[in-house]
Amino acid sequence: MLNLPRLLYPLYERRLLKELNGARQPGHVAIMCDGNRRWAREAGFVDLSHGHRVGAKKIGELVRWCDDVDVDLVTVYLLSTENLGRDEAELQLLYDIIGDVVAELSLPETNCRVRLVGHLDLLPKEFAERLRGTVCETVDHTGVAVNIAVGYGGRQEIVDAVRDLLTSARDEGKTLDEVIESVDAQAISTHLYTSGQPDPDLVIRTSGEQRLSGFMLWQSAYSEIWFTDTYWPAFRRIDFLRALRDYSQRSRRFGK
């Protein structure tokens, strides 16, 4: 029996690519990879960790999709500060999976420039050291830049940025009045985990949840947001292209 949707997907994909040809596209896409466990549960898996494993494989695909349409930077939200409150067995599984994802993205043939964004001191020391050691190998790569948000919380990032700003001012011998005078949005931005990078143009969240849950709380102030009911393990290239098409049709106002 013919699988009609599967036959139509390539045609729909070509149509989307045609619509995107010459259209305005985001330079930075941030994505919240949500719905792994729900996908596994609804797919009938007894071991819900299977959802995390399938979702992990999707990340490499996402990076290739970004490369295909000239998205320069992608931020992938993998582990929040709130997630660190899960039971130890699930956390250890997540650490192993995330470590493998970062290792795969850091391979020479993948050519990604990988950066960690998050409060890494909240992570187990061995896991954090593994991640740091792996991403160091990508410094000379020239492909898509990939931020891995791990141990990340939007409020925590702003707190860390302010602390870093104040520490720098103290080390420079500035007075309190000088510090107060120097604090503005740009000053805080230079101390964020993503310092030196553009804010996300487009934020995508899978799984049907319609909130950002503190993801890139500072940087997403003027981002376009795209929600989809699709769980992350089931997220397809046509879903990604639909998000880009929707973005290209919006009029960005940047708060004006």
Curated annotation (Swiss-Prot):
SS bonds (residue pairs): none
Enzyme class: transferase
Ligand binding (Mg(2+)): D34, E224
Cross-referenced InterPro entries: UPP_synth-like (IPR001441), UPP_synth-like_CS (IPR018520), UPP_synth-like_sf (IPR036424)
GO cellular component: plasma membrane
CDD domains given in the database record: Cis_IPPS
Amino-acid positions noted as binding substrate in the UniProt annotation, renumbered to this chain: G35, N36, R37, R38, W39, H52, S80, T81, E82, R86, R205, R211, L212, S213
EC number: 2.5.1.-
The UniProt record lists the keyword Glycoprotein: no
GO MF assignments: ditrans,polycis-polyprenyl diphosphate synthase [(2E,6E)-farnesyl diphosphate specific] activity; magnesium ion binding; Z-farnesyl diphosphate synthase activity
BP-aspect Gene Ontology terms: polyprenol biosynthetic process
Cofactor remark: Binds 2 magnesium ions per subunit.
Active site per database record: D34, N83
Keywords: Magnesium, Metal-binding, Transferase
Transferase among keywords: yes
Needed cofactors: Mg(2+)
Family: Belongs to the UPP synthase family.
Annotated function: Catalyzes the condensation of isopentenyl diphosphate (IPP) with allylic pyrophosphates generating different type of terpenoids.
Quaternary structure annotation from Swiss-Prot or TrEMBL: Homodimer.
Name listed for the protein in its UniProt record: Isoprenyl transferase 1
Species, as recorded: Corynebacterium efficiens (strain DSM 44549 / YS-314 / AJ 12310 / JCM 11189 / NBRC 100395)
